[in-house]
Structure formats: C-alpha cells, structure tokens
Regions:
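Acidic, serine/threonine-rich low-complexity disordered tracts
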Residues: 189-336
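Bacterial N-terminal signal peptides that target proteins for export
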Residues: 1-10
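N-terminal signal peptide c-region/cleavage motif recognized by signal peptidases
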Residues: 18-20
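Low-complexity, serine/threonine/proline-enriched polar segments
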Residues: 87-161
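N-terminal helix-cap/turn-to-beta initiation motif at the start of protein domains
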Residues: 29-45
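Hydrophobic/aromatic beta-strand elements that line small-molecule binding cavities or substrate pockets
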Residues: 64-66, 70-80, 89, 107-109, ...
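Short helix-loop boundary/capping segments
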Residues: 137-192, 212
C-alpha cells in the first residue's frame, strides 16, 4: 500500500455508485449489451499494481532504464451511465492504516459509435478528431482524463468476446508522457500507445504496448515499453474513504468537467499554456476539491475559482508542434 502524506501524495500521483442502465441493444449490434457489461465490470474495489518495463532500445546508444513498479488501493465508480455513454471515476485510497485518505485519480469515458474522439496532438495540446460513420459502427471510444479532469488521450476500438474473453483493443494513438517520466526525463516527447483492456476472473488488466517518440526534425522511436496495470478485486481496506470523498466533491468535479467539455465542444484545437509537468494547473483544482470536502469553500465558489484557473492555463493559440515541444522545460539535474 502507498505510504504517503496527503500533500506529497497529491504531487506524486497527479500523474456515489450509480445503478446500471438497462440499455436497449441496437438492432445492428447484438453484442452491445456484452460490451456494456465488460465496461461496467471495471467498476469495483481493487488492489492495483502498475508494472512498466522498457524492452527494446531503438536509438543508437540508448540504454534501457530500470523497471518502474508501484501499486495501491483503488476504487472505480460508475458516475454516469446513459446507455451509450459510461463514465468511470478512479479514486486511490492511500496512507498508513487508520490514517487513509483519498486521491482523485484518472477517469475513463466510454462512448458507443462516437462521431468524434479526443486526440492528443503533442506538446500538451489536443483536438477533437471526427470519426466517420464507417469507422465508428459498432465501436466504442475510450477517452481518458487526468486527475484534474484535463484531457489525456482517446481512441476508438472494438470490444470482442471471443473464446469467453472480453477485451477492447484500439489502433495505436499518441498520448502525453506519463507522470513517472514527465517529472524526470526530457529525452522523448510523446508515447505511441496501443491499449488493451481485458476482463479477467479476478478483475481486469490494462495492458500497454508503448513506443516512446522523439518529435524533433527527424522523428523516431527511442525505446519500446510494456506496461501491465493489474486490478484485482480486494475489499480489505476502507473503501468508504474514497466513496465519502466522492459524495462530498462530485458536484464540484461535475462543474470542473463542464469547463473542460466546453473547450472540447468549441471545435478548435486547444492546449495548455505551459509545457512539461502542469502542477500549476492540477494542484489548485485538487486543493479546491479538498476545501469543498472540508466544507470551507462552497461548491459553486470552488467551481468559479476552478474556472478561472483553467482559463489561465489553457489556450486555443497552440502554435506548431515544433514550437510546443521546444518550449518544454528541462528537467532537474540527475534526471534521465
């Protein structure tokens, strides 16, 4: 279990149950309800391990780095289910026994037969990419969001249920650096990733086949990496710590999501006004959630302040990919 103080954990990791909807299956996809069951099966209480290992160096002189292993307790809750849209919120429960506290983690949104999908375009910038009907038929988009509900990446793929195994695998898509590398490395700029979500008898597994990209005048792959995030059903920790946090803050986070959704819905590419680790953005938003949880700041006041923070650190004047990548700050001495 993670052993962190509340302040340290927020920095280190910023890297109400909802009843399922009985959705009517589309006439052209009898597997629709199986798809939904697989997505909803990812909700629950878990002991999670995160295992990332570089495997194949592809740039001359590059040496594979040590594996990065971590883990913790995590609850996953269905926060919205309208049939063809499902949203799952992850919340970590960390700290010593008897002193556990919650940390809002990532969110995954699932949309059936999407007309567009969130796409990372490098250098802390995103756009909504149109998805032709021929590509979205029978497919699900997964869009992933950061701890502060800012965007991370998205992709469109097919849930399959062959040989009694439910899994979703999309084509490769770009994504930002993970926080485990964002704070320590400046030798690559983006990840070309293939995801696989697989439902297992013990929970589910998120597999990643990652290629770490250098986006200079000669774009190339630095190294390949395999990631396996394993979610095992586990109840022997105070899951109510996470649930109580969500009950207290869910209206605030709904307001924050609305601010980000407005940027997506505007139809223009958008990005952050900073490159590298966006602590100046996520830290105030998490702190405002803490104030709402403690009752020291009213929810609507916190949403208004969060809106100002998001406005300060976002822009539609994103420039070129080259300019964004070159503006990324250098990491501290000793980073690799």
């Amino acid at each position: 279990m993670l052993n962190l103080t509340r302040t340290a954990a927020i920095g280190a990791l910023a890297c109400a149950l909802s009843a399922p909807v009985l959705a009517e299956a589309p006439d052209d996809n009898p597997g629709f309800e199986k798809d939904r069951e697989a997505i909803l099966a990812m909700a629950g209480n878990y002991d999670v391990t995160f295992d990332f290992r570089e495997t194949v160096p592809l740039a001359e002189g590059y040496e594979v780095k040590e594996p990065k292993l971590s883990g913790g307790y995590e609850i996953v809750r269905v926060i919205e289910d309208t049939g063809e849209f499902i949203s799952l919120q992850h919340i970590l429960v960390v700290g010593d026994e008897g002193e556990e506290f919650p940390i809002k983690h990532w969110r995954q949104d699932w949309t059936y037969e999407p007309s567009e999908v969130l796409t990372f375009i490098g250098g802390n910038a995103w756009e909504m990419r149109p998805v032709p009907a021929s590509e979205s038929e029978g497919q699900w988009a997964q869009e992933v969001y950061q701890v502060d509900d800012s965007p991370r990446y998205g992709a469109v793929g097919d849930w399959t249920h062959d040989n009694s195994v439910s899994q979703w695998t999309p084509p490769a898509e770009w994504r930002p650096l993970p926080r485990r590398d964002m704070t320590t490395r400046d030798d690559y700029d983006a990840v070309l990733a293939v995801n696989r979500h697989t439902i297992t008898p013990f929970g589910w597994v998120h597999e990643q086949n990652n290629s770490k990209l250098v986006l200079d005048e000669n774009p190339h792959v630095l190294v390949r990496e395999i990631g396996v995030n394993t979610y095992r059903h586990f109840e022997d920790y105070p899951v109510e710590v996470g649930d109580d946090y969500w009950t207290a803050t869910k209206d605030y986070w709904a307001g924050v999501r609305a601010e980000w959704e407005a940027l997506e819905d505007a139809g223009e590419p958008f990005g952050l006004t900073m490159q590298g680790e966006p602590e100046a953005l996520y830290q105030p938003l998490l702190e405002l959630a803490g104030e709402v949880e403690e009752g020291t700041t009213p929810t609507q006041d916190a949403i208004s302040e969060a809106s100002d923070v998001i406005a300060e650190y976002t822009t539609t004047e994103i420039g070129t990919l080259s300019s964004r990548v070159n503006d990324a700050p250098e990491k501290e001495d000793g980073a690799y």
